[in-house]
Amino acid sequence: MEVSAGLIIFVRDFAIFFAIYLIIALSLNLEYGYTGVPDFGKVLAVAGGAFTVGFFPGRIIAWLFGIGSGLDYITDNTAIVTDVNKVLMGTPAISIAIFLATLVVAGAIGAVLGLVACYPAIRLREDYLGMTLLAMGEAIQVIGYNYTPIIKGNLGVLVPDPFGWAGNLRYAVIAVFIIGICLLVFYYLERLVRSPLGRMLRAIRDNENVSESLGKDVTRIRMKTIIVASIMGSIGGALDAFKAGGIIATSYQRVSWTFWPWVIVVLGGSANNMGVVVGTFAFTAFRRFIDYYKEQLAPFVPFNVVWLDLLLLGMMLILIQMYRPEGIIPEKPTPTLSHKRLKKFIISKSAVSRPEKEEKELF
């Protein structure tokens, strides 16, 4: 039985969209779900990563290979990036190296943005910290719109294609890389939240005064959490820019990259990475369904169908908060050692300490 090309394209696009949003939603879940930091400026990290892709790799490759000497990268962006892509098509190793190096730089930019965003208000209560992060998210949008040397403002720029060497399989290769990075992020966060550090984050979220009384530096831990989450958000933004092949400032605004991740986390269940996976899948399926059937749905709605997803997802968020605020998969107790392993550990410890006790009794 042959699989139609349309179905393959649908599954591929679905997987890419799902993986990118999952990375960003997981980073938000680390901040809000596990640490209690209401990051209402998630777009800051995402846009920072995307802007890095628009600024960094094209200039580096053009400089290394002497492309576009005497030309302005922003003004002559199309011509320069076209020549850059010709070079990358014949050098897969360099292409992948540039791709990975750009992700590293995007992560570093995300860390700096996270530090700058949280530093002024990290000692304040969660509501004031959330407002500060919201303001920082708005600030990077204004910079992207008006400071043209980065990504040419509202006109946008093309970005180098590190997967052009794959030919017709370009999008399949992109999907493999993005899904692979998404799995690494998920694995890292699962290990983190199951560790003593994860239990400490929950303790800070539940009662920071008690945590401070036990000697925990709540301010520093919150700051580190925001920085780590911003690194992940920036990597997600960079992957989105590479996938699109170009970047424009208007693509990175708070509805898509702050509101939607919040919907995902609330829908799936905060402080539960599997819940975020389910929420991301439900969100992606809903968005893809509306995108593919807009024309068929248009006669049944009394307004422009482009606003349908905003309306329905907003209603879904309200209903979830009213009737199931814990999300589809509620938070579960932190996994520790299994009963079998714990019993084995206790027996081994008691066996070691018994000879010592007997030796003391002899004397």
For the regions a protein language model found, what residue spans apply to each?
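Transmembrane alpha-helices and adjacent helix-loop boundaries
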Residues: 1-363
